[in-house]
Amino acid sequence: MNLKKIIKLADGSLLTPDIDIDIEINGGYGADLMSDVLAFSQPDSVLITGLTNPQVVRTAQMAEFRAIIFVRGKQPQPETLVVAMQENIPLISSPFGMFELSGRLHKAGLPSFESNESD
């Protein structure tokens, strides 16, 4: 699914306008525990989270996420924006909570990219 469509479905605000959003996202993963993100996510997906610190972007980069959506209208810390620009990872803010947003995206056809296997 194209990130532009995801932003529309999320009623999202793009926080990194200088980063290209004409990219394909293959699935979604929602979590606030970054150790779970590293252990159970799959590459080329969108991370849905309530955390807004710079570590979220660093974790997303390590796990090969293509974009990050902050839930409940949260805004990232200024340093988070800087790291996202350096790593070329689009940041989006959505007014929906994690459960609602995940459901909307899944209903629209975005598959879950949560692995059921632990290391």
Show which residues each predicted segment covers.
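Absolute protein N-terminus
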Residues: 1-2
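N-terminal intrinsically disordered, cationic/polar leader segments
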Residues: 7-8
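Short secondary-structure junctions
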Residues: 12-18, 112
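Compositionally biased, intrinsically disordered low-complexity regions
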Residues: 14, 29-32
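Histidine/lysine/aspartate-rich catalytic loop segments that bind and position anionic ligands
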Residues: 19, 26
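Feature captures the catalytic cores and cofactor-binding loops of soluble hydro-lyases/lyases
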Residues: 22-23, 31-46, 51-119
